[in-house]
């Protein structure tokens, strides 16, 4: 995997419109002069979004001075998201937000966003491609991973084979995805009483791929679920480390700020 080209300065972007994808998934379209030149081939890549300061409601973006980042008086709230799609012809960027409620920095901003609303953005970054070429693929994640999963499926060759597992809390979040015919899409309902996350359980029960000489996988979502899935894929499926990209987006019971350092420890772990 190579790294995506990174635009390191904060861009200021303007709200254009929004679209409901499912009950708890909301697409926001953005534009702005700073967005011109954004790479077209980075759908699914990581971006960092800056939301208005929660106390003042004011959006002020950090600036770089040499190797230093200078934060403003009204420090914005940073959150990690994925590029859903960029359309250079109209200079529009789509970001899909999981809407947990109006009190959250990201989902709350998306729910209330209207003409005049703005955010800051840095990116794209991360591995390219998000899933390595192989005879057979395993893709798994929760609702927070759907934007990246959707982008991956749209980029895969038409003859790609494998399984996709997506865990949701509510049946109303199940929706159609564009995908290669032989990538089997499986929606799973989360059971909070299960000791083992649904994604890990589903991957354990997969039949062995026939005539597959290479495997690759993409796993994203809640911390413990990602860890469990990664262990199974490394230990049971013997997927090579360079063919497996596993990224925890969040951890149940922890804020983004409290989880930040732990996330990087999980990503750096070797299995």
From Swiss-Prot:
Originating gene: vuuB
EC number(s) reported in the record: 1.16.1.7
Keyword Cytoplasm set for record: yes
Record CDD domains: siderophore_interacting (cd06193)
Subcellular location(s) of the protein: Cytoplasm
Lineage of source species: Bacteria, Pseudomonadati, Pseudomonadota, Gammaproteobacteria, Vibrionales
Protein's name in the database: Ferric vulnibactin reductase VuuB
Catalytic activity annotation: 2 a Fe(II)-siderophore + NAD(+) + H(+) = 2 a Fe(III)-siderophore + NADH
Secretion signal span: none
Task of the protein: Ferric-siderophore reductase involved in iron removal from the siderophores after their transport into the cell. Acts as a major ferric-vulnibactin reductase catalyzing the reduction of Fe(3+)-vulnibactin, a catecholate siderophore synthesized by V.vulnificus.
Subunit-level organization: Monomer.
Enzyme class: oxidoreductase
Entry's family note: Belongs to the SIP oxidoreductase family.
A GO biological-process term: vibriobactin metabolic process
Pfam family, one: SIP
Sample GO molecular function, one term: ferric-chelate reductase (NADH) activity
Domain FAD-binding FR-type, first and last residues per copy: 8-131
Keyword Magnesium listed: no
Keywords (A to Z) from UniProt: Cytoplasm, FAD, Flavoprotein, NAD, Oxidoreductase
Main location (coarse class): cytoplasm
Cofactor: FAD
